[in-house]
Amino acid sequence: MNSDLLTKPVMEAFRAYTAGVRWVWLDLDDTLIDFRANSIAALYATYSCCQLDRYFDSCDEWVDSYLRHNHALWDLYNRAEITQAYLRMHRFLDPVREKCPGISEESFTDEANRLDKVYLDLLAQQKCMVDGAVELVKHLRAHSYNIGVLSNGFTDVQHRKLHAVGLDKLVDAVVLSDDIGVNKPDPRIYRHAMERSGDTDPARHIMIGDNPSTDIAGALASGWRAVLYDPAVTQAVLTAGGLAVPSLRLLPSLFQGI
C-alpha cells in the first residue's frame, strides 16, 4: 500500500464507516471492466466489418463521432429522458447523419440494428479490465463479503462481458437496470438489489463505482455506503459523500473481512 495515497487516519475512518457492511456492490463498466478500451477496440472492428468507410473518411473519425454521440445519449438515458431503443438506434444514426444529412431514421433502421448487433457481439468478447479489479473481487471473496454487480448496462451484453473475463463465477448477484426498468441513481434499483440479496438493511450495503451522478448519488440517497473510483483524485479521501480513491488497488487493505 502507498501511504501517500492512503493514510492511516483515512483507513481507520473508513473501517468505522463500513462497520457492518456485508454486501459489496460494484458497477461493471469502467469500474471492473475497462469499458472505454474495450469499446474502442470493438468500434474499430465494427468499422471494418460493416464497411463504415462508406460514411466516414477514417476509422478515427467514426470512433470519435460515435463516442461523442454515445456519451450524450447515455446522459439522457441515465436520467430516463430517452428509451433504450432510442439510444441504441441514435448512437449509430446520429454520427452517420452528421456526415450524410439526408439519411432518415426509417431508412437507416435495418443498418442501425445490424451495427448494434455487430458492435455488441464484438464488445462482449473484449477482456480488458480496470487495473486492480480482479484482485479486489478475489480479495472480497476470500474475506467472506457477498459481491454483487449493479449496472445500467444492457442485459444482452452485460452477462456475456462478465463471462468473458471470468467474473461470473465470483459474484453472488447481478442486478441490471434493463431487467427492472429503472436506472441508477433511482433508489428503486438499490431497493431491488437489497431485496435480491435478502438483506434489506441499507447500512449493510456499499456501492463501488466510477460515476458520482449515478453510482454514488443513488447509493447515498438509498442509505448505502459508497466508494467513488476516480483516477483523477490524488489520494484517498473520506467525506460525507463516501470514500474517493484513485486506484482500486487501495481497496483490499480497507476491506478486512466480516
Residue ranges, per PLM feature:
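Asp-based, Mg2+/Mn2+-dependent phosphohydrolase catalytic module
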Residues: M1-V24, A37, V134, K138-R141, ...
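Active-site neighborhood of HAD-like aspartate-dependent phosphohydrolases
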Residues: D4-R68
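Short, acidic loop-to-helix structural element flanking the phosphoryl-transfer center
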Residues: F14, G20, A85-Y86, F108-N113, ...
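Alpha-helix N-cap/helix-initiation sites
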Residues: S39-I40, F56-D60, Q84-A85, E105-T109, ...
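Hydrophobic alpha-helical core bundles mediating ligand binding, dimerization, or RNAP-core interactions
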Residues: S39-Y47, Y66-N70, F92, V96, ...
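A general structural signal for well-ordered alpha-helical segments in protein cores
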Residues: L43, V63-Y66, M89, Y190, ...
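Short helix-capping segments at alpha-helix termini
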Residues: Q51-Y55, E98-S107, G166-L170, G198-D199
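A metal-dependent, Asp-based hydrolase signature
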Residues: H71-V118
